[in-house]
Amino acid sequence: MKRKIIITLVLCILALSCASAGRFSIKAQFSPYSLQSIAIESGNYYSSYGFDFKAGARYNIWDRLDVGLDISLNNYRYKDFDTSYLVIGFKAKVGYGFDFTEKIFGQAEMGLGLDIRKVEDRSQATFGFGIYMGGGYRFTDRISATAGVDIEYGFQNGKSANSTDFAANLQLGAIIGL
């Protein structure tokens, strides 16, 4: 069901980009070292580190206002245990960009979504909120390089305990306009 909803949203964005004067682009970001901390209601606190990769589609709806969808893949390893876990995330985002010069720009994005955390044989769903702030250099009208800071917060209401997580990382990426 979730897969059908995501595919439908992506197809709607593609249809809108073909039907109007707006602009459609693909954005990919990577962080080789991401830090995350998890606090569990029972008082336990865990720190982890790993990589973060995001890919998504953006649609320019007005001036520099964009809407988009991101899919992220994170692999974290607990610092205190010999255990790693995989996080797959889906976020709907709204962003705004501004130009400093013809080639240099800034951008800010805010997103809401769902993170699915796979720890050993268990899967956990976490509601997530994220903010990205950064900028970039426009090589051509269609190709840009970006760098920025991505901060994410998640909350999970589990069967045994509630947990919150906080992640921060430096993202390097590219935008390709279609």
What do the predicted segments below correspond to?
Residues 30-32, 53-59, 71-73, 90-96, ...:
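Residues on the lipid-exposed face of transmembrane beta-strands in outer-membrane beta-barrel proteins
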